[in-house]
Amino acid sequence: MARLNSKAVAAAVVLAAVVLMMAGREASAALSCGQVDSKLAPCVAYVTGRASSISKECCSGVQGLNGLARSSPDRKIACRCLKSLATSIKSINMGKVSGVPGKCGVSVPFPISMSTNCNNVN
């Protein structure tokens, strides 16, 4: 896979936090930032404005990540990864980020925002 620049990784992590907060099942393995980045890499072009439409590969990654984010600790870790990387990225379109789960058929029961407190993610 091509090496992702920090802007691309941050955009992927922003999207990851959104997806990870919605799963409710328990899992035994911890989710890693590497897994998040890998699943969401196809979404980077869309959420940074380099693509006008969301790709099937992006939605596949979002749905796959939703399946991996089964425990509260996994979702909290992903949220923290997102915040540590995404705060330095200014070109992310949060309107597009917040719309990705819905466009991919994944339901998020709360507003998507960079102000999300990762400690409150369940």
From Swiss-Prot:
Residues 1-29 form the signal peptide. SUPFAM superfamilies: Bifunctional inhibitor/lipid-transfer protein/seed storage 2S albumin (SSF47699). One of its GO terms (molecular function) is lipid binding. Disulfide bonds join 33-81, 43-58, 59-104, 79-118. GO terms for biological process: lipid transport; response to ethylene; response to hydrogen peroxide; response to salicylic acid; response to wounding. Belongs to the plant LTP family. Plant non-specific lipid-transfer proteins transfer phospholipids as well as galactolipids across membranes. May play a role in wax or cutin deposition in the cell walls of expanding epidermal cells and certain secretory tissues. This is Probable non-specific lipid-transfer protein 3. It comes from Triticum aestivum.
